Structure formats: structure tokens, C-alpha cells
Regions:
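Conserved S/T- and glycine-rich ATP-binding loop of Class I adenylate-forming
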Residues: 35, 41-44, 66, 78, ...
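Generic beta-strand/beta-sheet core signal
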Residues: 38, 51-54, 81, 87, ...
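Gly/Ser/Thr-rich phosphate-binding loop
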Residues: 99-102, 129-132, 142-211
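Conserved AMP-binding/adenylation subdomain of ANL enzymes
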Residues: 59-77, 87-129, 143-145
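Short Gly/Pro-enriched turn/cap motifs at secondary-structure boundaries
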Residues: 27-30, 188, 210-217
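Structural core segment of the AMP-binding/adenylate-forming
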Residues: 1-16, 134
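Conserved pre-ATP/AMP-binding loop-to-beta segment of ANL
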Residues: 10-11, 17-40, 47, 71-77
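Alpha-helix/helix-capping structural signal
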Residues: 56, 136-139, 163-164
Length: 217
């Protein structure tokens, strides 16, 4: 468990919500191909379609991409500012991090991160190592933030999602939040794919993928 800091208001710790006397809870074994959940597409291509994700395959892919794309492990903390209605909200806010044993931060309203004070409190008080934001939110943060840099010594990886990342916004994102210039994990995914299918990796120092590109499949 991470050391708590009372400076971050409206923060609820999972350990405070569960019965600490019960270290293990009952669970049921299921087959790997058993349906886990149904998530509907946005409907941008017509009538929304319900996508069924299986238990074993989905969990394995969630864990794999968290490790490979972001470098997540059980000693790190990830903040994925995605609504639960998006597949990324399922995969990179919940199932992926928890399957690894990492710490994940759930934001009830991701738009609240446009408050510079709130964002800094989250990043510094909760020692966020991986910050994964929608490009729309990155632009909004830039539009309302001061010109001061919010550099955190804890941040190791930055990620973007949702729409193309321009070079201008990408450079601002890196310059503002990281101590050193790091590769942005600019991601492409679909509801149907369960998670990321194209992106640079967190430690990609070879291909030099340009901003706005998600690389090759």
C-alpha cells in the first residue's frame, strides 16, 4: 500500500472500503472462453453493436499490453483518464493494472483533470508513473493551464488516445509533464480489439516514431 497523503481531496482508497479481516474472497472458476462483459460501440458507424469479450483472452491481452506498451508492473501507479464506457476504461483503468497487481487511479470525471491544482495533487501525492490521456483532454489542459511546467519526478511514461496526436500538442505534452524527452505511447485501438493494437512502446528508442503516428502494426 502506498503512503497516504491527505492533501488530495476526494480521494477514496480501496483498502478503506473492504473488510480487512477477510484476506480472501470466494471466487468461481470459469472457462477461458466464457463471456466476461458486453461493451457497445459508440455508434459512429451506425447502430451501436454489443461486443462480447471473453474472460481468458481478454485478461491475458489486457495484462500483456499494459506490460509491453507502458512498462507497467506491480510497483507502479497508472492513471488512465478514460470513461468506463470506453474499452480503454475497462482495459487500462481496471482489468489490466489489477491483473498485474499494480496501483490504478480511477477518476470519476476525467474532465476534472483540467484543474491544474487537482492534476498536480494527483500526480505528486499519488506518485503517478504512467499518465494515459485522451488527446482532447490534453488540448483542454493546455488551453486552461498556466505556462508553468508540471514536471513530476515520478512520471516515466506518457500515453495518448482517442484521436490523432499533432506534433505541436505532443511536444507540449512531453515538455510540460516529463523531466526528460520521452516517447509518447500514442495508441490505436477499437472496442472490438479489447485494447491497443498499434503504438510505440514506452522504451522505444529505435524506430523514432513521429508524433501523430501509431507506428506499424
Amino acid at each position: 500500500n502506498k503512503k497516504k497523503n491527505n492533501n488530495t481531496k476526494s480521494t477514496v482508497y480501496f483498502d478503506d472500503l473492504i473488510d480487512k479481516k477477510e484476506k480472501f474472497h470466494k471466487y468461481t472458476f470459469v472457462k477461458s472462453n466464457k463471456s466476461s462483459f458486453i461493451l457497445f460501440t459508440s455508434g459512429s458507424t451506425g447502430y451501436p453493436k454489443g461486443i462480447i469479450h471473453s474472460t481468458g483472452g481478454y485478461l491475458l491481452y489486457s495484462k500483456y499490453t499494459c506490460i509491453k506498451q507502458f512498462g507497467l508492473d506491480k510497483n507502479k501507479t497508472i492513471l488512465t483518464a478514460s470513461d468506463a464506457g470506453w474499452i480503454n476504461g475497462h482495459t487500462y483503468s481496471l482489468y489490466g493494472p489489477l491483473s498485474i497487481g499494480a496501483t490504478t487511479i480511477l477518476i470519476e470525471k476525467p474532465i476534472s483533470l483540467i484543474s491544474e491544482k487537482f492534476l498536480k495533487n494527483i500526480l505528486f501525492d499519488l506518485k503517478v508513473n504512467i499518465l494515459y490521456l485522451p488527446v482532447t483532454l490534453i488540448r483542454l489542459i493546455k488551453s486552461v493551464s498556466s505556462k508553468k511546467r508540471i514536471k513530476s519526478i515520478y512520471l516515466e511514461t506518457l500515453g495518448s488516445m482517442g484521436e490523432p496526436l499533432s506534433k505541436y500538442i505532443g511536444q507540449w505534452f512531453t515538455k510540460t509533464f516529463s523531466e526528460k524527452k520521452i516517447q509518447i505511447v500514442n495508441t490505436y485501438y477499437q472496442t472490438e480489439t479489447a485494447g491497443i493494437i498499434c503504438s510505440p512502446k514506452f522504451n522505444d528508442n529505435i524506430s523514432k516514431v513521429p508524433y501523430g503516428s501509431v507506428g506499424k502494426p
